[in-house]
């Protein structure tokens, strides 16, 4: 029997109990946070007709999978210029899951859901019409990736889960077809986050899949204390072996080849939860960061020859500054300080702080968690999906985190912690982060998990859609972020992949302020976001330069671009 006080505490329970019984950390969610008068986020879920409730099918057996889902995506599946919403769901579990029993998604309550945005901004559930309803027994959905893998101009969906993944091809007529078997991307085991990227710059999107632990209903263990002395709890991942990640190469004919072993991805084993992509060393090839849960995080350097080298330890991002592992969950790989080099942020459990690694430009990263203000603002929280985006369009990327402890029993063993937590927003002021409360939703507690980001109403500021464990999803509209000027950039590749994923964009505003972006859909936790880039311009009415470095190597420039519009850029032939 394993003792669990916090999720990590079964190994060192007395230490964690005594540490927190004497800790002087406020559990008030509003203490030490600043209010922001100019920008508010408004919960508009009900008025948009979004009625999704995540069904994790919690049981008394504390099956580990119950506490880990679900994800979401913001993407325009029908090319009408309006973002649509996809949310993943769990499955019906029996209590207990007897030999031979499988998760069951046949009941509509457990379906993943696709919501199409109407012309008036409301949404209609089109799941069944789109061919995305139900699923045979044995499948429990986790995350979602978005990308146009066949370059036909329509965004496809890849849904991860327990005991198999699904690739849905977008037919271009409002429907999807399950092509998993033909494509050869079914995976296996417990897959978590996934993302499309072009690792060999051949113009076709490849697919990276993170996998968590080698767990099954049969191997699920009893963790915690037996009643009446204590309560049963979800087991720490140390109770289970890790799994290898999967790299699928796009063959260009609708099929993929598993290149994990040949490319150097299959070793070592990890406990992957989040994945993100960026070219951290500027060599023109996209690298991969995997957030692992309580084992070393992985940074896969792309060698440019179809192989990767795992350099997390050497680069300084495998462990925290004390040389310890942490419970890596959500991840973003983006330039927070506008120096042209993508940095790494990783969410974590309470007591540990979220990690921020600054890219030093020499292949190394420096842990700036405390110096940046992120450490002090996050010590008492547990974070999942995260994203660096400029919510107030002042030119600095701010940090959002969907939050909740992983243990629904945490308050019984650690009274200073909370299971339900409000989302977190840290405002970036010239590279230093301070917590802000931009509206009532940031004082409301949820079981946050996945979150996706994008401009739902095309007004130039970023909105948020979050999927909450066992709760209703929410949509937060950004009200006031467009008071500052902004420039949206939507690109289409010709020689490069059609989505332009992996393209690097530099924006120089009229005053000379410079920002850098990487075109991506994958980041956070189990989720996929709008591929369009939004650059906050502050009071500047123009961008004097927009420079796009395509994955093909082509460099494209636009000059004197007016603010408050979406610039549409098509990759030139040379």
Enumerate the language-model features and the residues they cover.
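Bacterial N-terminal signal peptides
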Residues: 13-28
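Gly/Ser/Thr/Pro-enriched helix-cap/hinge segments flanking short amphipathic alpha-helices
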Residues: 34-40, 58, 376, 418-421, ...
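Blade-edge beta-strand/turn elements of extracellular beta-propeller
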Residues: 41-44, 122-132, 173-185, 254-266, ...
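Repeat-based blade/solenoid architectures
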Residues: 50-71, 108, 130-145, 184-195, ...
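Beta-propeller blade termini
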Residues: 69-79, 116, 141-154, 169, ...
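Hydrophobic beta-strand segments that make up the repeating blades of beta-propeller
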Residues: 85-89, 152-161, 207-211, 283, ...
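Short, conserved, GDST-rich strand-edge loop motifs in beta-rich repeat architectures
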Residues: 88-107, 211-240, 401-419
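Beta-propeller blade signature
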Residues: 110-118, 243-251, 301, 357-358, ...
């Amino acid at each position: 029997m394993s003792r669990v006080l916090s999720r990590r505490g079964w190994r060192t329970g007395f230490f964690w109990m005594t540490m927190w019984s004497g800790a002087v950390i406020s559990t008030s969610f509003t203490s030490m946070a600043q209010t922001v008068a100019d920008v508010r986020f408004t919960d508009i879920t009900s008025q948009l007709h979004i009625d999704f409730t995540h069904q994790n099918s919690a049981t008394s057996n504390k099956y580990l999978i119950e506490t880990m889902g679900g994800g979401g995506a913001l993407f325009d599946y029908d090319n009408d210029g309006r973002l649509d919403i996809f949310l993943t769901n769990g499955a019906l579990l029996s209590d207990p899951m007897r030999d031979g029993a499988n998760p069951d998604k046949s009941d509509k309550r457990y379906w993943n859901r696709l919501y199409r945005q109407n012309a008036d901004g409301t949404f209609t559930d089109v799941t069944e019409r789109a061919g995305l309803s139900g699923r045979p027994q044995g499948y429990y959905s986790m995350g979602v990736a978005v990308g146009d893998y066949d370059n036909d101009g329509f965004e496809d969906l890849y849904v991860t889960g327990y005991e198999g993944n699904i690739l849905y091809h977008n037919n271009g007529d409002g429907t999807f077809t399950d092509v998993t078997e033909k494509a050869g991307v079914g995976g296996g085991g417990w897959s978590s986050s996934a993302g499309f990227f072009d690792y060999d710059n051949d113009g076709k999107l490849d697919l990276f899949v993170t996998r968590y632990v080698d767990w099954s209903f049969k191997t699920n263990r009893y963790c915690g204390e037996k009643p009446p002395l204590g309560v049963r709890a979800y087991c720490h991942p140390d109770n289970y072996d890790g799994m290898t990640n999967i790299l699928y190469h796009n063959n260009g004919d609708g099929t993929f080849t598993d290149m994990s072993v040949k490319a150097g991805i299959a070793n070592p084993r990890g406990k992957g939860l989040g994945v993100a992509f960026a070219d951290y060393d500027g060599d023109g090839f996209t690298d991969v960061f995997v957030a692992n849960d309580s084992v070393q995080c992985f940074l896969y350097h792309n060698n440019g020859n179809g192989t990767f080298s795992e350099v997390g330890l050497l680069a300084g991002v495998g462990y925290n500054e004390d040389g310890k592992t942490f419970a890596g969950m959500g991840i973003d790989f983006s330039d927070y300080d506008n120096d042209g080099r993508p940095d790494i942020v990783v969410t974590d459990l309470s007591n540990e702080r979220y990690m921020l690694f600054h890219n030093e430009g020499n292949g190394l990263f420096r842990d700036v968690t405390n110096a940046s203000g992120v450490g002090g603002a996050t010590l008492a929280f547990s974070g999942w999906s995260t994203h660096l985006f400029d919510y107030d369009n002042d030119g600095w990327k701010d940090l959002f985190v969907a939050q909740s402890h992983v243990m629904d029993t945490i308050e019984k063993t650690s009274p200073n912690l909370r299971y339900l937590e409000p989302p977190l927003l840290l405002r970036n002021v010239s590279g230093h982060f301070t917590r802000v409360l931009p509206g009532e939703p940031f004082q409301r507690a949820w079981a946050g998990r996945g979150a996706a980001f994008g401009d739902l109403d095309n007004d130039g500021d970023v909105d948020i859609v979050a999927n909450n464990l066992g709760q209703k999803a929410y949509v937060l509209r950004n009200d006031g972020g467009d008071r500052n000027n902004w420039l949206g950039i939507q690109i289409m590749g010709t020689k490069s992949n059609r989505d332009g994923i992996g393209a690097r964009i530099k924006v120089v505003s009229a005053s000379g302020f410079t920002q850098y972006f990487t075109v991506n859909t994958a980041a956070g936790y189990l989720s996929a976001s709008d591929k369009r880039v939004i650059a906050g311009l502050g009071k500047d009415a123009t961008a004097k330069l927009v420079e796009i470095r395509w994955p093909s190597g082509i460099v494209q420039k636009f000059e004197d671009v007016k603010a408050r519009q979406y610039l549409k850029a098509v990759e030139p032939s040379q």
